[in-house]
Swiss-Prot record:
Its main location: membrane. InterPro entries: P-loop_NTPase, T4SS-coupling_protein, Ti-typ_conjug_TS_TraG-like, TraG/VirD4. The type IV secretion system VirB/VirD4 is a major virulence determinant for subversion of human endothelial cell (HEC) function. VirB-dependent changes of HEC include massive cytoskeletal rearrangements, a pro-inflammatory activation by nuclear factor NF-kappa-B, inhibition of early and late events of apoptosis, leading to an increased cell survival, and, at high infection doses, a cytostatic or cytotoxic effect, which interferes with a potent VirB-independent mitogenic activity. These changes of HEC require the T4S coupling protein VirD4 and at least one of the effector proteins BepA-G. It comes from the Bacteria. The keyword RNA-binding does not apply. The keyword Cell membrane applies. It comes from Bartonella henselae (strain ATCC 49882 / DSM 28221 / CCUG 30454 / Houston 1). The lineage of its organism: Bacteria, Pseudomonadati, Pseudomonadota, Alphaproteobacteria, Hyphomicrobiales. PANTHER family: CONJUGATIVE TRANSFER: DNA TRANSPORT (PTHR37937:SF1). It is found in: Cell membrane. This is Type IV secretion system-coupling protein VirD4. NCBIfam families: PRK13822.1, TraG-Ti.
Length: 639
């Protein structure tokens, strides 16, 4: 572990305080014996070794207790070394005093050592007692569970940190944690407090664990409860280190202001911020990738079908009627969107979602009349067939379909959000050039009401990478914080399964596994776990998630000692037996109750589970110096 100059000075302080104690004890004794009688002076002088050794140990003990927890272990080591040197000096002086008598008149060392100064002997003993107390206080408590040497019922174990350094070297670009065991640190039994550095332990100074997108699908899922430092421990550090393009969903709207200048310094990058509440926001046309005439028309038609799904709320319903209206609303949106894109009626600047909304904002009768006109005039068989469903539909049925489609595109009536997805400041394909970053400052309150806003923007960028067909400079990292707000997105599953070859890597953040199951179902959630390079868990409060982690970490074999005692008049002392039992590597209640918020468990295929720290940016000086002030948290001083 690397220490700063200040920390090294604090760690070496026992040497200075011990030397000062050795210097002051004789002066203190000479001051005390000034007015004493001769017979009293003798014992005070004799007590000098005892006082010196005891005070050296006592001063180091009290000094250690006054220091931060993560420094105490190193201070104890220095204190022990200094005390041993001091003790050896006094013992050596006694041996030197007794040495001339050894060999005379048959005197041996065994006999001569009986005449060692008792003050030295007791001083050494009492000093080591104080040092033992210091060691006990500074050493973290170890687990009472005794692992068996034989893995009869399982041999699950945590990944060795050397192996972790090989898999996740410190010189990578995507920061996932810090290479140290929080549960073995001095502060393991103290809750993590961001404003109290004494609770940080080795956090902020340990080497980083980083991912180079060099194994598996390159996708990642992070689970952390509310207030679990998802943004500060992973999103911000990664934005400071990843040199490729980033598309970042930020419902808290705090990330871009913190990292935009750091991103711009990385090779003169173009940092685009999509913020509907800012006058300086950029905008683009989310349909621009569908307007590329170099792509075959049949493929563009298929893309329109998939994109239309992003506009609809994908809430699962057991009501067959609601399911029917949702399906037909999707068909209606597909037909109208295809008309907007392919019809000669519109200029290129009008081929956007505003035009789609303008059609749907008409009365039902006007929409039906326009659909009939489209059916009669369009040369496209695809559009004609899609529209034909609705021209002969019963009025009441069409009313339900129209209401569903109108409701799910209602957000396009909000001018600032409509402008965001219907502009021309840049193209979605720009992210393939390797020099463009996009931050989506979409407030959580808006995404809760209109998740389609986030879906169409992210979907446009994902589809732009597919359209690029492997023609990209660097892999695009999609950092989707609070991705649960977007609801179900089929395109995310497509990116998960085929995104690696198209240059997309997903970094998804959920509060619990239940959110993943809610949108993708049990089978879908299993597919996500199987397809990701790794899954990280931290700050878990949900019992079911804790049970899932416990099961995935595996079982180990432990030794259990049983003791039986005899009662009554029996003279036997009882018996003791040892048996082997199965135990989870970590139990659900240990995950919820004992794991600190700056600790995480990382699971990946083919390797043992990794238990390590989290790279919270404000604990690391180099990261803190690179970021701007976070308006949601007090800023520590940069040094």
């Amino acid at each position: 572990m690397k220490y700063t100059k200040t920390q090294l000075a604090l760690i070496s302080m026992p040497i200075a305080s011990g030397a000062l104690t050795i210097f002051l004890v004789p002066h203190m004794l000479s001051f005390v014996i000034n007015d004493l009688k001769t017979n009293q002076i003798y014992w005070y002088v004799r007590s000098e070794p005892l006082l010196t050794l005891m005070l050296v140990a006592a001063v180091s003990l009290f000094y250690t207790l006054s220091q931060k927890l993560h420094l105490r272990k190193a201070i104890t080591f220095v204190s022990t070394a200094f005390f041993c040197i001091t003790a050896l000096y006094y013992i050596g002086s006694e041996i030197k005093r007794l040495n001339p008598y050894v060999g005379q008149q048959g005197i041996t060392w065994g006999y001569a050592l009986k005449f060692m100064d008792p003050m030295v002997v007791f001083g050494v003993i009492l000093g080591f007692v104080l040092l033992a107390i210091q060691v006990i206080i500074t050493s973290p408590r170890t687990s009472n569970v005794k692992r068996a040497k034989k893995g009869i019922f399982g041999d699950a174990a945590w990944m060795n940190l050397k192996e972790a350094a090989r898999i996740f070297p410190s010189n990578g670009q995507i920061v996932i944690g810090e290479r140290y065991r929080v549960d073995q640190d001095n502060v393991r039994n103290i809750p993590f407090a961001p404003g109290n550095k004494t609770t940080w332990g080795k956090g902020g100074t340990a080497p980083l664990l980083t991912f180079n997108l060099d194994f598996g699908s390159t996708h990642m899922i992070f689970f952390a409860g509310s207030g679990g430092y998802k943004t500060t421990s992973t999103v911000v550090p990664t934005c400071l280190t990843y040199t490729g393009p980033i598309v970042c969903l930020d419902p808290s709207t705090e990330i871009a202001p913190m990292v935009k200048f750091a991103r711009k310094k990385m090779g003169n990058r173009n940092v685009i911020i999509l913020d509907p509440n800012s006058l300086l926001t950029k905008n683009f046309n989310v349909l621009d990738w569908l307007l590329d005439e170099n792509i075959p028309r049949t493929r563009r038609e298929a893309n329109i079908v998939s994109f239309s799904k992003l506009l609809l709320s994908e809430k699962k319903s057991e009501n067959s009627s609601a399911e029917y209206f949702s399906t037909q609303a999707h068909n209606l949106l597909t037909a109208l969107l295809a008309h907007v894109i392919f019809s000669d009626k519109y200029e290129d600047s009008e081929r956007n979602l505003k035009t789609l909304r303008a059609i749907l904002s008409q009365s039902e009768t006007a929409v039906v009349n326009q659909l009939r006109m489209i059916q009669e005039t369009t040369p496209s068989p695809f559009i004609r067939e899609m529209v034909g469903i609705f021209t002969e539909m019963a009025d009441q049925t069409f009313s339900g379909v129209y209401t569903t489609a109108s409701k799910d595109t209602q957000w396009l009536s909000l001018s600032n959000y409509a402008d965001l997805v219907c502009g021309n400041d840049f193209a979605s394909s720009d992210i393939a050039n390797g020099k463009t970053d996009v931050f989506l400052n979409l407030p959580a309150s808006i995404l809760n009401s209109y998740p389609a806003i986030g879906r169409v923007i992210i979907g446009a960028f994902l589809n732009a990478m597919v359209t690029a067909d492997g023609n990209y400079k660097k892999r695009v990292l999609f950092v989707l914080d609070e991705v649960d707000l977007l609801g179900y997105m089929n395109i995310l599953e497509e990116a998960r399964d085929r995104g690696r070859k198209y240059g997309t890597s997903l970094m998804l953040f959920y509060q619990s596994s239940g959110q993943l199951v809610n949108h993708f179902g049990e089978a879908g959630a299993r597919s996500w776990f199987e397809s990701c390079s790794f899954v990280s868990y931290a700050a878990i409060k949900d019992l079911q998630t804790a049970k899932d982690i416990s099961e995935r970490c595996g079982q180990m074999t432990i030794e259990v000692t049983g003791t039986s005692k005899s009662r009554g008049l029996s003279l036997t002392k009882g018996s003791q037996n040892i048996n082997y039992q199965q135990r989870a590597l970590i139990l659900p209640h240990e995950i919820i109750q004992e794991m600190r918020q700056d600790e995480q468990i990382i699971l990946m295929q083919g390797h043992p589970p990794l238990r390590c720290g989290r790279a919270i940016y404000f604990r690391r000086k180099e990261m803190l110096a690179a970021t701007e002030k976070n308006r949601f948290a007090p800023q520590a001083k940069k040094s």
